[in-house]
Design a protein with these regions (language model features):
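Residue-level signature of catalytic and energy-coupling elements of molecular machines
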Residues: 16, 42-44, 78, 107, ...
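Primarily NTPase-proximal linker/entry elements flanking Walker-type ATP/GTP-binding cores
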Residues: 8-136, 143-164, 171-190
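Conserved phosphate-handling catalytic cores of large alpha/beta enzymes
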Residues: 171-175, 179, 183, 195, ...
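Residue-level recognition of specific faces of alpha-helices
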Residues: 1, 15-18, 37, 47, ...
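Long amphipathic alpha-helical segments used for membrane anchoring, targeting, substrate engagement
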Residues: 2-19, 288-443
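Short, small-residue-enriched loops and turns at beta-alpha junctions
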Residues: 110, 139-141, 165-167, 192-196, ...
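Amphipathic alpha-helical interaction segments
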Residues: 29, 33, 50, 54, ...
Length: 443
């Protein structure tokens, strides 16, 4: 995500490396590169110029503390400016009413229908809401079928009127149905078009006027850059929506839409889509996104994802097993599967400070597959008691998993080291754990 922008900004900060003071000359050199990085990210010239002018004003007015280098100060100023550009504080979706009506708008191909299902899943699983999805696209039967399939995947009812060609009537009837069936949120997926046109605008404006939604969200494909921003402006001028959803953000290396859409339409980005899976949806936090752009990671989101996957009761059981030295490959496999559910290795790595520099070639998304294959080739007794894994058993496991003995031995070694480290963490041996980690690094 935004790899190109991150690399260019990092290079621009190197101009200040070794400099004792911030001066007009070195600030000008740095900001020339920052402006170029923003323009390459598909940020408009006016916004790039405004941002760099703000940074210059703040940088030249700062006093350098002896403990902070000019480069560090510049990173902090750029971070704050990027966060402010993307909206500052995050904005919550308004679902206080009962039922809360959420209207979804956007161009065809923006990921609107997929987002509708993701939002339903999010509100059901993380907010405890009873959700009704509404198929309001009367022009594309495939869109109705898609929403029905996705609704089934996430366990959410989908309201349809197959014979009707009136989206206003469908939306009105769906809200009545939701009230009769005690639904707490109604999500209305509307028709998309290949381009902005008057018929589309009139239609969705009529739906909005009839059902009076508590939240209107505009969905855009972040990979379309300034086109996404221009489309959002055209919609907002007519529809006056409440927030933006950026889809396909995981494939966006530039970041122009995320950086500029707020300043153009004066509406917050509320959600971002990060993949095809139904749980690949995140609340948008401008400050956390600025952290990730500048290679500072996003530990808060990483911890939140971990908390969603790791059950407190299971963690307590695991702690007891570790204390008794009973951690086995069944437990190890369970931990691996929980980590997998948190997201792709690439996305998780981007949340760890400094890990954004790791190239795609160094990230093996299939690494867990071979681990699962090796553990799957063990007998129940071997998984329960790893101490019995002698040479002949390891050769059999390698053959059964389609790997080689080196990979099997490596996994067993990793298992043993993980077990020791986790045991030290649970028994309070922090000092011993740090010594062990330093020894592992020296190998």
């Amino acid at each position: 995500m935004f790899e190109g922008l991150s690399e260019k900004l990092e290079r621009s900060f190197k101009i200040l490396k070794g400099q004792g003071h911030i001066t007009e000359i070195n600030v000008a050199e740095t900001l020339k590169e920052v402006r170029k990085a923003l323009l390459d990210a598909d940020v408009s010239y006016k916004i790039a110029k405004d941002v760099t002018n703000n940074i210059k004003e703040k940088a030249l007015g700062q006093k350098i503390l002896t403990s902070i280098s000019p480069g560090q100060l510049m990173v902090k100023i750029v971070h704050d400016e990027l966060a402010e550009l993307m909206g500052g504080d995050h904005a919550e979706i308004n679902i206080k009413a009962n039922p809360a009506i959420v209207l979804i708008a956007g161009l065809q191909g923006s990921g609107k229908t997929t987002f509708s299902a993701k939002l339903a899943n999010f509100l059901k699983s993380k907010r405890g809401k009873s959700v009704l999805l509404v198929a309001g696209d009367v022009y594309r039967p495939a869109a109705i079928d898609q929403l029905k399939v996705l609704g089934e995947q996430v366990g959410v009812e989908v309201y349809t009127e197959i014979e009707s060609k009136d989206p206003v009537s469908i939306a009105e009837n769906a809200v009545k149905y939701a009230k009769e069936h005690n639904k707490s949120v109604v999500i209305i997926d509307t028709a998309g078009r290949l381009a902005v046109d008057e018929q589309m605008m009139d239609e969705i404006a009529a739906v909005k006027a009839k059902v009076n939604p508590h939240e209107t969200l505009f969905v855009v494909d972040s990979m379309t850059g300034q086109d996404a921003v221009n489309t959002a402006k055209a919609f907002n001028d007519r529809l006056d929506f409440d927030g933006v959803v950026l889809t396909k953000l995981d494939g966006d290396t530039r970041g122009g839409a995320a950086l500029t859409i707020r300043s153009v339409v004066d509406k917050p980005i509320k959600f971002v889509g990060l993949g095809e899976k139904m749980d690949a949806l995140d609340i948008f936090y401008p400050k956390r996104m600025a952290d990730r752009i500048l290679g500072m990671g996003d530990i808060v989101t990483l911890v939140e994802k971990a908390q969603e996957q790791f059950d407190a009761e299971e963690a307590s059981k695991l702690k007891k097993k570790l204390a008794k030295n009973e951690f086995n490959f069944n437990d190890f496999l369970k931990q691996i599967q929980q980590i997998k559910r948190m997201g792709s290795i690439k996305d998780l790595a981007a949340m760890i400070p400094g890990m954004n520099k790791i190239s795609d070639e160094d990230i093996d998304e299939d690494a867990f597959k071979s681990i699962e294959a090796i553990i799957g080739s063990m007998t129940p007794a071997e998984r329960e008691n790893p101490k019995i894994l002698n040479g002949s058993r390891r050769r059999r496991i390698a053959m059964g998993s389609g790997t080689d003995i080196v990979e099997v031995n490596r996994l067993i070694k990793q298992f043993e080291e993980t077990s020791k480290m986790m045991r030290l963490m649970t028994t309070g041996g922090a000092k011993k754990m740090m010594q062990m980690m330093s020894q592992m690094r020296r190998r």
